[in-house]
Each structure stands twice: as structure tokens, then as C-alpha cells.
Swiss-Prot record:
GO terms for molecular function: phosphoribosylanthranilate isomerase activity. Its EC number is 5.3.1.24. PANTHER family: N-(5'-PHOSPHORIBOSYL)ANTHRANILATE ISOMERASE. Pathway: Amino-acid biosynthesis; L-tryptophan biosynthesis; L-tryptophan from chorismate: step 3/5. It comes from Maricaulis maris (strain MCS10) (Caulobacter maris). It catalyses: N-(5-phospho-beta-D-ribosyl)anthranilate = 1-(2-carboxyphenylamino)-1-deoxy-D-ribulose 5-phosphate. One of its GO terms (biological process) is L-tryptophan biosynthetic process. It is an enzyme of class 5 (isomerase). InterPro entries: Aldolase_TIM (IPR013785), PRAI_dom (IPR001240), RibuloseP-bd_barrel (IPR011060), TrpF_fam (IPR044643). Keywords: Amino-acid biosynthesis, Aromatic amino acid biosynthesis, Isomerase, Tryptophan biosynthesis. Belongs to the TrpF family. This is N-(5'-phosphoribosyl)anthranilate isomerase. The gene is trpF.
Length: 211
């Protein structure tokens, strides 16, 4: 069975739909440039609604002050670092926030996977996302995919998630190509940027279950 992280949730209805679809993780984005942004306070309120999923605070190059806000207001199970954080910063963030760390890494070509090695055993999990287009003002693939088969040759010891451009039409092929045991989806379950669709959430989970 392939585990799912439904990311960018903003309402209790989103959480209910994600957990009904079997989410292992639910993600809450704390980054003002994202259409999925929620404040640490709202993220904390949402986390209290999560009953069966592990909660993930998704951040981009957070300073210690923001990490403290997330830790205290949200109390997530995980913190996802989705910026240019160094391995040393990952170590510092884990020690400061006292939470498991998911480090996101951008992928466009095979050489990008070399960046994973310094984070192996430093982060608790890795997440491979599409490299953002040139000139983008925020990280992530922004709904775009990449050659998922590049991940088939990964040689790392920590668990990892496949992300970037996934939806119900391509998730089976992507998982097979990458050899992934867990996936992350956000824009692929939306009716508009930042607006989750319960039907698409259920459809994504059903498509993955049928692989």
C-alpha cells in the first residue's frame, strides 16, 4: 500500500476528506507567498481536528522564531523544510523544534539527486518535488511533473515521498516509474489554487488504491 500525504489543507472539511481517503499525513503550509498559506495559529486549530493522520507543518527557510511559533501553536508531528536549508540547518531545526524533519529537494535531472546524499540520515524523511520554473517566487513544482523514473536509482536509507505534478490520472504510472512507497499531492486535488476538492481527494486515493 502506498501512503499519501495530502498537503496544503486549509479547512476542517479538507482534513475530514483527506482522512476519509486514508491520509497518513496531512500538511499545512506556513508560507505567505503560497495560495495554501495558513498562519501558525490557524494551523494549530486545524491540527486539533486531525484524528487519524500525522500532521506536517510545511515551511520555507524558517528562522528560529517561526519554528518556535510552529512548535508551540501547532505542535505538529513533523516539520517539512521546503527551501534551501542546508544539512546543518536541518540538524539545528530538529534540535530546536524537537520534531521529525522532512526535507524537500527539487528534481529536474539525474544530477539533482546527488543533493540527497548530504541529507541522508540528517533528515528523518526526504521529499522529491519538481524543480520550480525559472523566476518562480516560491519553491516546488507548482503543479508540474518531471521524469519520475529518475528516482528509481535512489540509494538512501531514510524513507522518501514522491511529489510534483501528481493527480489521479498519472499517480499510478508515477509510482511505478519511481518505485515510490509514499506520495505527496496538493494542486492535483484542487478545483482552483488553494481550494481543495473533496471529490478529487477521494478520486486520487481511489486511483492509487487501484494501481
Amino acid at each position: 500500500m502506498t501512503d499519501i500525504k495530502f498537503c496544503g489543507l486549509k479547512t476542517g472539511r479538507d482534513i475530514a476528506a483527506a482522512e476519509a481517503a486514508g491520509a497518513r499525513w496531512t500538511g499545512y503550509v506556513i508560507f505567505p507567498k503560497s495560495p495554501r498559506h495558513v498562519s501558525p495559529t490557524l494551523a494549530g486549530e486545524l491540527c486539533h481536528l486531525a484524528r487519524t493522520s500525522e500532521t506536517v507543518a510545511v515551511t520555507v527557510n524558517p528562522d528560529d522564531d517561526l519554528l518556535a511559533q510552529i512548535r508551540d501553536a501547532m505542535r505538529p508531528d513533523w516539520i517539512q523544510l521546503h527551501g534551501s536549508e542546508s544539512p546543518q540547518r536541518v540538524v539545528q531545526a530538529r534540535a530546536y523544534a524537537k520534531r521529525g524533519i522532512i526535507k524537500a529537494l527539487p528534481v529536474a535531472e539525474a544530477s539533482d539527486l546527488d543533493a540527497a546524499n548530504p541529507y541522508d540520515r540528517v533528515a528523518d524523511m526526504l521529499l522529491f518535488d519538481a524543480k520550480p520554473p525559472a523566476g518562480a517566487d516560491r519553491p516546488g513544482g507548482l503543479g508540474h511533473g518531471y521524469d519520475y523514473a529518475l528516482l528509481k536509482s535512489l540509494q538512501i536509507s531514510v524513507p522518501w515521498l514522491l511529489s510534483g505534478g501528481l493527480d489521479d490520472t498519472n499517480v499510478c504510472a508515477a509510482v511505478a516509474a519511481a518505485g515510490a512507497k509514499a506520495v505527496d499531492v496538493s494542486s492535483g486535488i484542487e478545483s482552483a489554487p488553494g481550494i481543495k476538492d473533496a471529490g478529487r481527494i477521494a478520486g486520487f486515493a481511489s486511483a492509487l488504491a487501484a494501481c
